[in-house]
Every structure is written in structure tokens, then in C-alpha cells.
Amino acid sequence: MASFLEKKKTAAQIVANARGEEKVSAQELLAGVFDDFLELHGDRLSADDAAIIGGVAHFEGKPVTVILTNKGKSAQERLRTHFGCPEPAGYRKSLRLIKQAEKFKRPVVTFINTAGAYPGQSAEENGQGEAIARNLLEISSVKVPVIAVIYGEGGSGGALAFACGDSVWMFENSMYSVLSPEGFAAILWKDSSRADEAAEVMQLTPEKLLQQKVIDGIIPESRSHKRLFRAVKKVLQQELEKYQKLSASALVEKRQQRFQRF
């Protein structure tokens, strides 16, 4: 099957594809890339956020911790996950699993597809800002490799909380930005209908972000899930092999230097 990018797409088209119904799901990625996945639930404080799937799996025969944002497929599931927008319990669950991975010296792989953190009243009352900030602080110094893959929307701090790893990759039909094009257009021009124009200005596409060294590479997409999973596996194998060679102190120093560039 041909790549989705046979013809160069506009930023607006890439945004539409990142949000599209054909986008591979969290569950499909788990089944296609990893073996023996064991899901772990709860943040050990308050709740288990369905917008975050996390647990332990095998990748190429070795244990890894996997964390994915989950938009859901059915209408009922999407309501339960707030369309993939995590609550504080989701960020705290992910951090619990990352600290567990550090304890057992397992690398961490995150897959991100979220418009951003859930903005509801309950999230604010339960410390949404603190939960995101805690993830950023703790992951910056965790002593195991953290590989992040944005496979759809990468929205604001809600996405950054999972993408502050050693290596960040994007699917070719994905986006990564501080806010949505609609939000950008509404703030800058007081006209959300100019979202397509905003998408071009924001430089939120994988190609632009790679040029600016915000990300480390682009994963080609295909309508064939088997081909897509092979591409993901190739990248993960390459990146894990690279970062597992480093000592814990070198790993943390390199990660912190990466983000100090910005």
C-alpha cells in the first residue's frame, strides 16, 4: 500500500489526518508492536483514568513499560476517556508506572494522541497543573530510557507530559503544538474559522518540527497496519539499543540537555 504522503500535504490536511477516524488506535498499537501486555491500573491515590492505558509488555523478547493515551473507539468509551484527554489520575498513573520501570530497570515507551489535558472542573479541583508539572519534573531525571511517539494529536502540556523523553518521534500524519489551530486562530485573529491558515503559521507538522530539531524522526504511515507496525518496531529497536548503552548519569544529562535547547 502507498504511503499517505505520496503527495505533499498541507498542514491543515495533516491536522485532519491526525484527528481522523482511520488513525490507528492505542489498542491496535499494543497488539501490533508488543507481546504479553499486562495492564496495570490506578494512580494509588484516587482513581484509574481510562484515557491512559499503561502496563508491562515484551518488546523483542525484553520487558518494557508501555504508556498510551487512549481516545477510545465507541461513543461510550470516548465519553469515558474525555476523547483522550487525561485527568490528573491519568498523569499520576503514568508517573507511577514510570517510577516502577526505573525501579526494575525497564525502558519506557509512550504513545501520544491527545488534544490536551482534560480542562473540566473536576480536573482542576484534583490538581491538573500539578500532575502535569510533576510528570515533567520526574521524567526529566528518571534513570531509564524514555522513548516517545506522537501518533495523532500532540496537544499542549497534556502531550508534553508524556513526550519529555530521550527521543521523540512522530507519525507522518500527526501534529504537535502548544494549542489547537482553532484556538490559535481565535486568540490571534479572533476568528476560529481561520484554523487552516493557523495550522500553516504554527509549523506543527512533523516535517517542520524535525527541521527545528524538536523531534528526532518521522515514522512513515501506511494503510497496512502490518507495514506500520514494522516501521514502529524498527524505530523502537534502534532507539532503545542506542539509549540502553548509556550509563544512568549520561542518560539523564543527555535528556536534560535536549530540553534545555528550547
Describe each region flagged by the PLM.
Residues 1-186, 190, 200-262:
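Terminal-region recognition feature
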